[in-house]
Amino acid sequence: IMLPNHAPLIVAEQFGTLESLYPNRIDLGLGRAPGTDPQTSFALRRDPSRANAFPNEVVELLNYFHPQDNQKIHAIPGMDLDIPVWILGSSFFGAQLAAKLGLPYAFAAHFAPTHMYTALDIYRKEFQPSQFLEKPYAMLCMNACAAESTEEAEYLFTTLQQSFTQLIRNDRKLTPPPIESMEQYWNPYEASQVSQMLKVSAVGDFAKVKEEIEEILRKTEVDELMFTGVIIRQDSALLRLSQK
């Protein structure tokens, strides 16, 4: 949830509803970015200045789940439910906030890996134990695209590469089908930018992807991994998800 787009009370009640329907299966991740283009942000009635209030709104939301003494407003459902709340981020700000509040931290390496190691280090060094966690707990989100062969995986991965190129061009469209080669699609600048944005990606046959994932775990020592994979062919996507 990009919290500046929503009222904390509404988020608490919505996730309280989900937790009531599916106990112990719901986590809530909170970010401060708009998460969309300016036009959509405006349609959501987003106030650009609300990003500055993000730390206070996180605390407000936590208090709806765990009410303070003499608190007048309550989330129903939501109150007294144990819903894990994560701080999402790709910069030092989120790492420091998660550490200060003693919350788990999820780093968005799937599109903004530049500060990955430093942000995780800051989070761990500055972490303050809380009612939620006794010690730091971190997750890394990364891209993964596995196939029977590395060639097929690289072919399928061009869908995501094209999408990120469109983002750089400010020309976002529907998810494109894969293409045989990116050489004719992007220019050198775009290739460099997209490659940096997608740097934390495991692409290849199943053995290669497994090896690359294990390497990321060794380097980051995160507690959990979350994978994202944009595969436009349903049969291929289902196959990839079914592989261990």
Residue ranges and their predicted role:
Residues 25-29, 84-86, 104-106, 137-139, ...:
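Structural preference for beta-strand elements that scaffold enzyme active sites
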Residues 149, 235-243:
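Short glycine/threonine-rich loop-to-helix capping motif typified by GTGT followed
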Residues 93-114, 119-120, 124:
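A conserved active-site cap/scaffold subdomain adjacent to cofactor or substrate pockets
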Residues 1-8, 79-89, 147, 197-206:
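Active-site mouth loops of central-metabolism enzymes
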Residues 48-74, 115-222:
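An alpha-helical appendage that flanks or caps ligand/catalytic pockets
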Residues 51-104:
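Aromatic- and glycine-enriched pocket-lining scaffold segments that form the walls
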Residues 1-3, 31-35, 90, 110, ...:
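Active-site beta-loop-alpha junctions enriched in small/polar residues
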